[in-house]
Amino acid sequence: TPLYSSAASDVYKRQILAWYKSGKGVSIFTILGLLLIWGMGFWNETMQTLALVLSSTIIALIMGLPLGIWSANSKRCDKILHPILDLMQTMPAFVYLIPAVLFFGLGTVPGAFATIIFAMPPVVRLTSLGIKQVPKNVVEASRSFGATPMQLLFKVQLPLALPTIMTGINQTILMSLSMVVIAAMIAAGGLGEIVLKGITQMKIGLGFEGGIAVVILAIILDRITQGLGKQKKGK
C-alpha cells in the first residue's frame, strides 16, 4: 500500500543516515526501532514529535550558538547570562508551559515555544565552555600570523571547540524531546499525547507503548548525534 511504501522509504532513509554517521550497530537498531514504532501504529505521532524536536532544536541552536560565542568573548555578557541560565535549568519543565499558553494558547506553537526556551541552556553553556578551553597559545599564534577576529573564530576556535559544542547540541536535542512529550499537556500532539492518554484514561498498555516509542526515538537521536560528534573530532 502507499502508506507502507512511504513508511518503508522513511525508515530506509533514516537507516542510511544512521549507518553513515554512527556505524552498523546503531544503524541496525535504528531500522528495527523505527519498524517497531511503525508496527505499533505510532508512525504519524513519531514523525510529529520528530518534526517538533528538530524544528525546536534548530531555532534553539540559531539563538544559542551566538549567545555562547558572545559569552565566551565577553565577561560582561557571561556575568549576565550565567544567572539566567542557572534559573532556566533549575526551573521545573512544567513552568515553561504557563507563558507559552498565555501568549499562544493551545497547540503546536506554544509547545515549540516552551521547548525552545527549555532546551537552549546546554548549547549556550557548552559553546562558551568549548571556546574558553581553546589553548591560549594557539589563539595568540593565530593572532601573530595576522588572523582577523572572524578568521580566529571560524578557523581556530570553533573547530577546536567542536567536540564540546556537539555535546551541547546532543543535550539540546534530548532536552527538546523530553519537553515535547511534556508539551502534550497543552495539545502539542505527537507521542506525548499517547503517553498522556494512557495516564489520564488508565490505559497502561497504551502509555507503555508510547513510552517505548519515545525511548527508541531518544536513543536514535542520541547515537546519531554522538556519531556525528566523533566523526567531526576524528577530522
Regions found by a protein language model. Give the residues of each.
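Loop-to-helix entry region at the N-terminal start of transmembrane alpha-helices
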Residues: 44-60, 93-126, 160-166, 206-211
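Glycine-rich helix-loop "coupling/hinge" segments at transmembrane-helix boundaries
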Residues: 102, 131, 176-214, 233-235
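Single conserved hydrophobic/aromatic residue that forms the stacking wall/gate
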Residues: 1-8, 12
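Hydrophobic, membrane-inserted alpha-helices
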Residues: 10-17, 30-36, 95-99, 159
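Short cytoplasmic-facing helical segments at TM-TM junctions of multi-pass membrane proteins
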Residues: 122-171, 195
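Transmembrane alpha-helical segments of polytopic membrane transport and secretion proteins
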Residues: 7, 225-235
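Cytoplasmic-entry segments and transmembrane alpha-helices of multi-pass inner-membrane transporters
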Residues: 30, 38-100, 126-129
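Transmembrane alpha-helices
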Residues: 113, 117, 149-183, 205, ...
